[in-house]
């Protein structure tokens, strides 16, 4: 599938149109950002790792009955996907306390959350992705009640699938974000799932194996990403 014009350039991916109006090419770049894009660095192999990682995870979710935008892997850093009408709200599932939740509530990092929390955030870097709720979504017309309920259902379903996948690999799925869109009126999982948008800890050492290594200047970012990929069975080379 030939990519044509650049449609959108995000913090770590570039989206291209194709000759098929229903399909897009996602190009995963080596860029890594923090602080809503204020800090950006490049890491060799990162685009390739995240692309293959994302393709692997999306394939697992498809097998579990979760509709995704994934079509097929095109190259080391490109994938073909369905063109979705994206919902401007991201879903976050939290299995343990970390990140903004710890700061907001003053609770201990790593606290087990049972049942897992479901949060919603408006996708807006300038406003630092403010937290919203279902009432905001309905009032401002970001997504209707039925589609939001489906997004919630699919988020928890994905959590069940992925928590087991990572647990079997000696990892804790602490939290993660998902983005959804509509394709022919149906809610479909879009964007990506990678260590960029999730928190993954080693089950024995509690070492952070995700983008917190970049946010907190811990070093070893790509080594951690590749180790997670290796453990769950992603073929990188």
UniProtKB/Swiss-Prot annotation:
Q: Does the keyword ATP-binding apply?
A: yes
The beginning of the lineage is: Bacteria, Pseudomonadati, Pseudomonadota, Gammaproteobacteria, Enterobacterales
- Molecular function GO terms recorded: ATP binding; phosphoribosylaminoimidazolesuccinocarboxamide synthase activity
- UniProt name for this protein: Phosphoribosylaminoimidazole-succinocarboxamide synthase
GO process terms (BP): 'de novo' IMP biosynthetic process; cobalamin biosynthetic process
Gene designation: purC
* Residues that span the membrane, as ranges: none
- Listed GO CC annotations: cytosol
Task: List its EC numbers.
Answer: 6.3.2.6
Q: Cystine bridges: which residues?
A: none
List the catalytic activities from the record: 5-amino-1-(5-phospho-D-ribosyl)imidazole-4-carboxylate + L-aspartate + ATP = (2S)-2-[5-amino-1-(5-phospho-beta-D-ribosyl)imidazole-4-carboxamido]succinate + ADP + phosphate + 2 H(+)
Q: Mind listing the UniProt keywords for this protein, alphabetically?
A: ATP-binding, Ligase, Nucleotide-binding, Purine biosynthesis
The pathway this protein participates in, as annotated, is: Purine metabolism; IMP biosynthesis via de novo pathway; 5-amino-1-(5-phospho-D-ribosyl)imidazole-4-carboxamide from 5-amino-1-(5-phospho-D-ribosyl)imidazole-4-carboxylate: step 1/2
May I ask which residue range the UniProt record assigns to the signal sequence?
none
Q: Which Pfam families match?
A: SAICAR_synt (PF01259)
Q: What class of enzyme is it?
A: ligase
Family listed:
Belongs to the SAICAR synthetase family.
Q: By its UniProt entry, which InterPro entries does this protein fall under?
A: SAICAR_synt/ADE2_N, SAICAR_synt_PurC, SAICAR_synth, SAICAR_synthetase, SAICAR_synthetase_CS
């Amino acid at each position: 599938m030939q990519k044509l014009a650049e449609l959108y350039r995000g913090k770590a991916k570039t989206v291209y149109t194709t000759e098929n109006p229903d399909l897009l090419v996602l190009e995963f770049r080596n860029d890594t950002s923090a602080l809503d894009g204020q800090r950006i660095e490049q890491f060799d192999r990162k685009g390739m790792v995240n692309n293959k990682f994302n393709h692997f995870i999306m394939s697992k979710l498809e097998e579990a009955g979760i509709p995704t935008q994934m079509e097929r892997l095109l190259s080391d850093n490109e994938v073909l996907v369905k063109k979705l009408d994206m919902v401007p709200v991201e879903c976050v599932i939290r299995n343990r306390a970390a990140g903004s939740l710890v700061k907001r509530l003053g609770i201990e990092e790593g606290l087990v959350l049972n049942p897992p929390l479901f949060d919603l955030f408006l996708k807006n870097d300038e406003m630092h992705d403010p937290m919203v709720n279902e009432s905001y979504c309905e009032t401002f017309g970001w997504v209707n009640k039925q589609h939001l309920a489906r997004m919630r259902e699919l988020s928890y379903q994905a959590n069940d699938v992925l928590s087991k996948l990572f647990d079997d690999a000696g990892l804790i799925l602490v939290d993660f974000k998902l983005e959804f869109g509509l394709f022919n009126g149906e809610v479909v999982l879009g964007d990506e799932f990678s260590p960029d948008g999730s928190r993954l800890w080693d089950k024995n050492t509690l070492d952070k194996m995700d983008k917190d290594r970049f946010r907190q200047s811990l070093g070893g970012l790509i080594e951690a990403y590749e180790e997670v990929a290796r453990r769950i069975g992603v073929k990188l080379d």
